[in-house]
Amino acid sequence: MPELITNKYQPQFAQITQVDDLDVPTLWAMQAEARHDQQGLMAYVSHPETRGFLADHGFQSVSQTYFAQLNIRDFSGEPVVPVVDLEADLKAELVMLLRDHYERTHRFNPPIPNIDYAKWLFGDDNFDATHSIVRLTKQHIVAAILIFQTDNHLALKWTFGDDVATLQALWRDLLGILPIGSRLLATFDTTDVLAMSVYEHFHWHQTAPAQTLMMWPRAANNLRIQ
């Protein structure tokens, strides 16, 4: 049954779950509730029919997310710095870069201003500081790959860098670090140009249908399009 959930870091939009099961009365009720709570609505949609249904009711397509898996094979990479070995000042720089990256890629649904990014990263027990790596140039971070452990798998959460070439080079190095035979799961969003370059450059395997993020702004003139 479709429900509304709210991300505490991005409370401007409530997310619709089980969006493919939506009917018109339920959607109207959700739009009315969101308007009352001064929120917009958002949904991740895989099926074209559902995309059309939501578009007919005032939703706009914002981005597309791809779900992928990279199989790690034998590869000799270049030396890099694991996050676990960073000094305190470089960890602080990494947190600042993560904040800038997250805000830049969430302009349609901006996060609240007081997120503790250090706690979000280093305070998460699933953060894998050993397999997460950065590239340093003149003692500054120019590219990063941040990996988490989830259900006995490695999972990419964020990756960013100064430019495409630098980031892709770091990814080639990563292939020489991850255990041979392991699998790296990831999602890639079209709002993140640098990460999408990684998705397009390496041989990722699709693990689920791509999803389109659709949003209904609370400032919409009508609850529904007639």
Specify the residue positions occupied by each region the protein language model found:
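Acyl-donor-binding surface of acyltransferase catalytic domains
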Residues: 19-81, 183-221
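A short beta-loop-alpha structural element at the N-terminal edge
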Residues: 81-98, 105-107
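Aromatic (often tryptophan-rich) hydrophobic motifs at membrane interfaces
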Residues: 144, 149-210
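C-terminal helical cap(s) of enzyme catalytic domains, especially alpha/beta-barrels
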Residues: 223-225
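A short, internal acetyl-CoA/4′-phosphopantetheine-binding micro-motif in the GNAT/acyltransferase core
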Residues: 8-27, 157-167
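A conserved beta-strand-loop-helix scaffold within acyl/acetyltransferase catalytic domains
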Residues: 2-13, 106-159
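Residues within well-ordered alpha-helical secondary structure of globular protein domains
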Residues: 97-100, 201
